[in-house]
């Protein structure tokens, strides 16, 4: 999912990091900060550093499992490995495992601007099947 405005970026970050969804923040990880304000500030600073304040602000992926198929610890490990492998440490990101439903699921929000090169991430139709699903399959299978 594309995040198109600054307020949408902050709201999405705040939503996935909500304590009541993550067992008091137990299941939150990433490389951009420990609270929504810090993560947002880091992402916006990267955009400012590269002069890329316009356009999409970030991306939000959700990875979910069927009820009973995964526990929070395993889901955390999967999202941590996915973030490291897919984003390669080049994008600011935060991920969170939500345990407030009958099925475990994780959210990843990452900056639209690469903090190393300054290029913007491009997501095109079919990229999930071609590039993203193979990474999750490799980690999960």
Predicted segments, located by residue:
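N-terminal nicking endonuclease/strand-transfer module with a His-rich metal-binding environment
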Residues: 1-141
């Amino acid at each position: 999912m594309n995040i198109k405005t600054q307020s949408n970026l902050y709201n999405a970050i705040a939503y996935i990091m909500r304590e009541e969804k993550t067992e008091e923040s137990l299941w939150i990880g990433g490389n951009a900060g420990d609270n929504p304000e810090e993560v947002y500030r880091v992402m916006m600073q990267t955009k400012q550093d590269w002069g890329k304040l316009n356009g999409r602000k970030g991306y939000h992926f959700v990875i979910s499992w069927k009820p009973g198929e995964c526990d929070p610890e395993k889901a955390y490990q999967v999202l941590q490995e996915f973030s490291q492998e897919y984003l390669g440490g080049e994008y600011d990101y935060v991920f969170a495992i939500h345990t407030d439903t009958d099925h475990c699921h994780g959210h990843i929000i990452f900056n639209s601007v690469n903090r190393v090169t300054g290029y913007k991430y491009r997501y095109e139709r079919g990229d999930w099947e071609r590039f993203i699903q193979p990474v999750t399959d490799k980690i999960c299978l």
